[in-house]
Design a protein with these regions (language model features):
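N-terminal and secondary-structure boundary signal
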Residues: 1-161
Length: 161
């Protein structure tokens, strides 16, 4: 497997958007992610209420969408899962992410409500040999996962064992 570049920059509220642009350059984003493919942005909503450092912040979503639009990406899907503890629609609202999507003419898509299809294991051996279900929206798409560095309630117990 080809090694990919990793980039880290110190940022500030004043330089955040230009820093994200620079990070994409350092990570050779344009060599890897292409505007002529469907692009899925995997948003991270850990809790439906707003807790700083817990979910995708609006400025991160805004910065990546700004860069995608600048690069003429058209087919963009902003998605998140439905979980037993999180209502993603409420989370999109309380975390101010809907406002960002509206700014770029996009809407939120809940993966649980979209179509699903069977993935043949010969397509991706990482997951084992049995068939797996996958959201239809990610078939043939490039996925950008918006990372959130955080602790989880299980981490203390898991790391202590």
């Amino acid at each position: 497997m080809k090694e990919l570049p990793v980039a880290v920059l110190k940022t500030s509220p004043q330089t955040y958007f230009s820093d994200v642009e620079r990070l994409l350059e350092l990570a050779e984003f344009d060599k890897i992610v292409k505007p002529d493919f469907s692009t899925v942005l995997k948003i991270n909503i850990t809790w439906q209420e707003y807790y700083p450092s817990c979910s995708t912040p609006p400025w991160q979503l805004d910065a990546i969408l700004r860069e995608l639009k600048k690069r003429e990406f058209q087919d963009i899907h902003a998605v998140e899962n439905l979980t037993v503890v999180t209502d993603p629609y409420r989370g999109m609202e309380t975390n101010k992410l809907n406002r960002v999507l509206e700014k770029y003419g996009l809407r939120f898509e809940c993966l649980a409500e979209g179509g699903w299809e069977t993935m043949n294991p010969s397509e991706c051996l990482v997951f084992g040999q049995e068939d797996k279900l996958m959201p239809t929206v990610i078939r043939g798409a490039q996925v950008i996962h918006l990372p959130t560095i955080k602790c989880h309630g299980h981490s203390q117990m898991t790391c202590a064992m």
